[in-house]
Amino acid sequence: MTTSSSGSVETSANSRLGTFSFASASFTDLLGGNAGAGGGGVSRYKAMTPPSLPLSPPPVSPSSFFNSPIGMNQADFLGSPVLLTSSIFPSPTTGAFASQHFDWRPEVAAAQSADQGGKDEQRNSYSDFSFQTAPASEEAVRTTTFQPPVPPAPLGDEAYRSQQQQQPWGYQQQPAGMDAGANAASFGAAPFQATSSEMAPQVQGGGGYSQPQSQRRSSDDGYNWRKYGQKQVKGSENPRSYYKCTFPNCPTKKKVERSLDGQITEIVYKGTHNHAKPQNTRRNSGSSAAQVLQSGGDMSEHSFGGMSGTAATPENSSASFGDDEIRVGSPRAGNGGGDEFDDDEPDSKRWRKDGDGEGISMAGNRTVREPRVVVQTMSDIDILDDGYRWRKYGQKVVKGNPNPRSYYKCTTAGCPVRKHVERASHDLRAVITTYEGKHNHDVPAARGSAALYRPAPPAAAATSSHPYLPNQPPPMSYQPTGPQPYALRPDGFGGQGPFGGVVGGSSFGGFSGFDDARGSYMSQHQQQQRQNDAMHASRAKEEPGDDMFFQNSLY
């Protein structure tokens, strides 16, 4: 009995030492030896060699984190089945290693995400041991790069973090195999077009608004268009606008339908352009703006057409594209192929087209503004006689002046001159008369012949009893230095009457301070008035009437 007990103690001791000395002996052998009868179980278990682990040590092996006891080889520990069956065979060797707790399962790692403070570096170092992420292909990188970020899926922190680290690399550094076509396809609008239509207007650069393609089409087609009508059509919620090419004699027109938010929904062209595209549109618009500024006023406020007998005579205006109020005074473009558009035009626009042939057409069939002459006089009456005959056709109150403005037109047939008269807002005695255009005729004769036989000055009456001799020049060349108290009517051009008499003396009746432009304008009228006076004086001498005998009897 003593011998057997001592032998069992020696066997158990030897077996424990063999656990640390031999790769084939382990604590499992002791269990097999004690349970088997006659030692047959132990020999049968020893005949079965443990399978070798098919693991190759990675660049950073987890074995470097183990604190092995002195005298123990790490290779023996990897060859032992204790590493794989520690949960099945309870043994004192299971908790013998005082190292950190390792769990290679991703579920446990996800549950311990709150304890990431001091273990992030360790997880990154050995994450390739358990979850070795394969390098993504070029197609995968393209898809991942431009897709919007998604919430992390429940696959572990390490895998999601490695996926997020690949995104900036794929965006900033283009792979070697990606060509221009593939890159353009990767930037395609598939991820963005899947959203609702509210995401259609994308914001670019510094906050600019990217218009839809259909809206850029109307503004960037290279041609100049003028809007001439707009109306609400049946069967459509959007209003329809009508445009016409501004090039002379170009029959091209187009219809544009816009939605309520301003986006273009449909564009229909009618006809073809018979000219090339303009070279520089901005230069033409700049010159038009310069003409408007040079004219010194807005012609749109003169609504000529109320009493003139014609239907809304189009005024002199520069070509302003896309403006509904301004007309171009060129002849109407050919109607070939434009009947469909003319049927849809509003009635008011058709009326305005009846007067397209009127106006002053200059070079290039484009209407040019005539110069303006502004004369300011001090008078208590509104009607100032300048020698021409005028017809009043309108009156209205303009912005910035409480006094009404009266509009006049020259009564001579074919004369384009117009004027408007108003009193200044700061001084009620100041009458401002603005002339537009130039007269293409002479100054008409005054109504009646009494003006031709007005009494001569006292000095002229002393030298001759007959004021009008056949070889004597008319008295219009005489300009006395003293005031003339017998002026027949006030005058609006510095005191110079229409028939040569000086009103108000050498000081021009107090109407001083005119500039050179007004002076040249008045000198032109003076020459015309002198010619008319000479003509009427010669006719009066050739055919004397009863008034002549009556005048001679007075002297």
Curated annotation (Swiss-Prot):
<keyword id="KW-0938">Abscisic acid signaling pathway</keyword>
<dbReference type="InterPro" id="IPR044810">
    <property type="entry name" value="WRKY_plant"/>
</dbReference>
<dbReference type="GO" id="GO:0009788">
    <property type="term" value="P:negative regulation of abscisic acid-activated signaling pathway"/>
</dbReference>
<feature type="compositionally biased region" description="Polar residues">
    <location>
        <begin position="310"/>
        <end position="320"/>
    </location>
</feature>
<feature type="compositionally biased region" description="Low complexity">
    <location>
        <begin position="163"/>
        <end position="183"/>
    </location>
</feature>
<dbReference type="GO" id="GO:0045893">
    <property type="term" value="P:positive regulation of DNA-templated transcription"/>
</dbReference>
<dbReference type="GO" id="GO:0009738">
    <property type="term" value="P:abscisic acid-activated signaling pathway"/>
</dbReference>
<feature type="DNA-binding region" description="WRKY 1">
    <location>
        <begin position="214"/>
        <end position="278"/>
    </location>
</feature>
<dbReference type="GO" id="GO:0043565">
    <property type="term" value="F:sequence-specific DNA binding"/>
</dbReference>
<feature type="region of interest" description="Transcription repression of gibberellic acid (GA)-induced promoters">
    <location>
        <begin position="466"/>
        <end position="555"/>
    </location>
</feature>
<feature type="short sequence motif" description="Nuclear localization signal">
    <location>
        <begin position="253"/>
        <end position="259"/>
    </location>
</feature>
<keyword id="KW-0805">Transcription regulation</keyword>
<dbReference type="InterPro" id="IPR003657">
    <property type="entry name" value="WRKY_dom"/>
</dbReference>
<feature type="compositionally biased region" description="Basic and acidic residues">
    <location>
        <begin position="347"/>
        <end position="356"/>
    </location>
</feature>
<keyword id="KW-0804">Transcription</keyword>
<keyword id="KW-0238">DNA-binding</keyword>
<dbReference type="InterPro" id="IPR036576">
    <property type="entry name" value="WRKY_dom_sf"/>
</dbReference>
<dbReference type="Pfam" id="PF03106">
    <property type="entry name" value="WRKY"/>
</dbReference>
<feature type="region of interest" description="Disordered">
    <location>
        <begin position="133"/>
        <end position="183"/>
    </location>
</feature>
<keyword id="KW-0010">Activator</keyword>
<feature type="compositionally biased region" description="Polar residues">
    <location>
        <begin position="277"/>
        <end position="294"/>
    </location>
</feature>
<dbReference type="GO" id="GO:0009737">
    <property type="term" value="P:response to abscisic acid"/>
</dbReference>
<dbReference type="GO" id="GO:0009740">
    <property type="term" value="P:gibberellic acid mediated signaling pathway"/>
</dbReference>
<dbReference type="GO" id="GO:0005634">
    <property type="term" value="C:nucleus"/>
</dbReference>
<dbReference type="GO" id="GO:0003700">
    <property type="term" value="F:DNA-binding transcription factor activity"/>
</dbReference>
<keyword id="KW-0539">Nucleus</keyword>
<feature type="DNA-binding region" description="WRKY 2">
    <location>
        <begin position="379"/>
        <end position="444"/>
    </location>
</feature>
<comment type="function">
    <text>Transcription activator. Interacts specifically with the W box (5'-(T)TGAC[CT]-3'), a frequently occurring elicitor-responsive cis-acting element. Negative regulator of both gibberellic acid (GA) and abscisic acid (ABA) signaling in aleurone cells, probably by interfering with GAM1, via the specific repression of GA- and ABA-induced promoters.</text>
</comment>
<keyword id="KW-0677">Repeat</keyword>
<comment type="similarity">
    <text>Belongs to the WRKY group II-a family.</text>
</comment>
<dbReference type="GO" id="GO:0009739">
    <property type="term" value="P:response to gibberellin"/>
</dbReference>
<dbReference type="GO" id="GO:0009938">
    <property type="term" value="P:negative regulation of gibberellic acid mediated signaling pathway"/>
</dbReference>
<feature type="region of interest" description="Disordered">
    <location>
        <begin position="197"/>
        <end position="248"/>
    </location>
</feature>
<feature type="region of interest" description="Disordered">
    <location>
        <begin position="270"/>
        <end position="365"/>
    </location>
</feature>
<protein>
    <recommendedName>
        <fullName>WRKY transcription factor WRKY24</fullName>
    </recommendedName>
</protein>
<keyword id="KW-0939">Gibberellin signaling pathway</keyword>
<feature type="region of interest" description="Disordered">
    <location>
        <begin position="514"/>
        <end position="555"/>
    </location>
</feature>
